[in-house]
Every structure is written in C-alpha cells, then in structure tokens.
C-alpha cells in the first residue's frame, strides 16, 4: 500500500491525457483530485494558478470549450483532473447529457479519487447544477471543497457576506463540505486551497 506523506510539487504538473469516454481514462491507481464547475466559473484559471503554470489548463472566453476529462500528472502517483464545465446554454442538450453521464461515471467509479473541488463564481454561487454535482459527490462519499472564485470582483465585505450565505446553505452537509474565497487575479486563498489538496493527497488510500 503506497502512502503519500509529503505535499506534491504542484509546479511539476504536466499534461498527461484527455478522455472523452470512461474507458479512455488512465489506470485507476495512485491518487487524483478533480476540479469541476460551471462554464466560465474560473476552473481552468484556478488550476493554472495552483500549479503556477500559465496555460496548463486551457482557458477560453467561450464557455463549454472543455468537453473532455483532462488529466495533469504531478508525479508518477498523483494527478489533478479537469472535469468538463457545465451549464452553458449554447451547448446542445445531447452533448450536455453525454458530459453529465461521463462525469457521473467518473465520480461513481473512480476509486483513486481523493476529493472534488467545486468551482463557483462568487457572484453566482449554488446554481442548480452546482447543487446537483454536490449531491452526486456526497452520495458517492467524496470529500468536497468549494472555491468561491473571482472574489476580487466584490468588496471584502460583500465577499465575506456571500461566503457566510453559502456556508449556511451547505451547513446540512456538515464536515463533508468545506469552502473558501479564491481569486486567480490576486491569489486570494491560494495557500489555503493548496493545503486542502495536500491533505487529501496525504490521506490513506
């Protein structure tokens, strides 16, 4: 049984592979932490800031561009995973349904998944699909950490107010969910999210 005691070197992240179907996923071994969120919530930007590698995860002004599960290797055993964005109205329903089925299969069956980071724009938190994803993850007993991104777009007081409102809304889940403020622009919350990821990676298999 392999144990991961030290924090991974996020700056060592390298693109590994992409999967459009469940059977295209890399071997289910080691440890993975996945990122998911609405299109344009800042998911790719968060991955780029966390790793310190500009352009690692492709960002786009066009929501819905990430249509596959993208894997980034930190080392031989540990990976960050960029799940398809959801909630973009211009994506055909058939395509959207395929994404949902792929993500659901990943969350349900991926044994090496250590935790799920749910990325939400702080100005539009807890949309219906966000709540659906949280329900999926809770049902599959996956730890969840919520990033309220783009916190620099609000005043400090407004950001703290929204943080409190979301905390109240998810309080029924207890310790299964944690959350924080985050900004890729001014790096608010960067050390905090890295600490959460490192704790998950160090957890027992």
UniProtKB/Swiss-Prot annotation:
Residue span(s) of domain EngB-type G: 29-203
A biological-process GO annotation: division septum assembly
CDD domains according to UniProt: YihA_EngB (cd01876)
PROSITE patterns: G_ENGB (PS51706)
TM segment ranges: none
Molecular-function GO terms, alphabetical: GTP binding; metal ion binding
Family of this protein: Belongs to the TRAFAC class TrmE-Era-EngA-EngB-Septin-like GTPase superfamily. EngB GTPase family.
Binding positions (GTP): 37-44, 64-68, 82-85, 149-152, 182-184
Cofactor(s) the record lists: Mg(2+)
One GO cellular component term noted in the UniProt record for this chain: cytosol
Keywords attached to this entry: Cell cycle, Cell division, GTP-binding, Magnesium, Metal-binding, Nucleotide-binding, Septation
Domain of life assignment: Bacteria
NCBIfam families according to UniProt: GTPase_YsxC
Annotated gene: engB
Organism (species): Coxiella burnetii (strain RSA 493 / Nine Mile phase I)
Cross-referenced InterPro entries: G_ENGB_dom (IPR030393), GTP-bd (IPR006073), GTP-bd_ribosome_bio_YsxC (IPR019987), P-loop_NTPase (IPR027417)
Function field: Necessary for normal cell division and for the maintenance of normal septation.
Name listed for the protein in its UniProt record: Probable GTP-binding protein EngB
Record Pfam families: MMR_HSR1 (PF01926)
Residues engaged in binding Mg(2+): 44, 66
Record has Cell cycle as a keyword: yes
